[in-house]
């Protein structure tokens, strides 16, 4: 009788463990599928343009137009602001309204550099913290890895659940400072004037 109880107890434990393992495999498989679809859509997109909104530390929202051309080229032109941003393969360039260089910073060790590469594999260059679906959005939380200068830098990406377009990104550095950009009126794989990525030097 004792052996019967012990065997039954072991059987129940095995069933519970099997259920947990099966559920975990299903969740992991679903996450992989979502990640693959987003990667496919992102890698098939060579150019992007639209409007962006940036939230500052004081909760003030500023806006402008953005243009991205892979690999590494982007232009963020702010509304009613004297300075804009143009990125290249090596630098984040701060420019005036006529695109003359004001200052520049290395881009290679920044998360945006990885996101704007020709092809991306999230699991290769980031640690996946979580993948969540809610309503019509997919939120992927990433952590930079294999990069000593970005230890602790977290990247939160929100995609549309219908067409896997990027809706917003938030980059949180190791000091807890957040850079949040929301994207609207997005157009993909369009022709972009090369002059938008030109940085002039006086």
Residue locations for each model-derived region?
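Bacterial N-terminal signal peptides that target proteins for export
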Residues: 3-15
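N-terminal signal peptide c-region/cleavage motif recognized by signal peptidases
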Residues: 24-25
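Gly/Pro-enriched, hydrophobic low-complexity segments
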Residues: 124-202
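Short, hydrophobic/aromatic-rich segments at coil-to-beta transitions
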Residues: 47-51, 71-75, 91, 134-141, ...
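An acidic-aromatic
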Residues: 66-114
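A generic structural motif
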Residues: 53-55, 77-79, 95-97, 143-145, ...
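A short, Trp-centered hydrophobic/proline-enriched beta-strand micro-motif
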Residues: 40-59
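Cleaved targeting-peptide boundary
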Residues: 28-36
């Amino acid at each position: 009788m004792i052996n019967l109880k012990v065997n039954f107890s072991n059987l129940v434990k095995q069933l519970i463990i099997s259920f947990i393992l099966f559920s975990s495999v299903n969740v992991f498989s679903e996450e992989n599928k979502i990640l693959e679809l987003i990667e496919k859509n992102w890698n098939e997109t060579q150019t992007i343009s639209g409007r962006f909104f940036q939230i500052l530390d004081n909760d003030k929202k500023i806006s402008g137009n953005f243009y991205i051309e892979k690999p590494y080229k982007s232009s963020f032109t702010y509304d009613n602001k004297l300075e804009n941003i143009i990125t290249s393969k090596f630098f984040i360039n701060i420019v005036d309204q006529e695109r003359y260089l004001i200052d520049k910073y290395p881009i290679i060790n920044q998360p945006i550099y990885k996101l704007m590469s020709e092809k991306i594999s999230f699991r290769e260059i980031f640690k996946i913290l979580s993948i969540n679906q809610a309503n019509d959005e997919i939120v992927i939380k990433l952590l930079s890895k294999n990069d000593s200068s970005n230890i602790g830098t977290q990247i939160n990406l929100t995609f549309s659940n219908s067409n896997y377009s990027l809706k917003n990104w938030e980059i949180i550095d190791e000091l807890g400072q957040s850079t949040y950009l929301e994207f609207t009126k997005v157009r993909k794989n369009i022709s972009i004037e090369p002059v938008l990525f030109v940085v002039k030097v006086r």
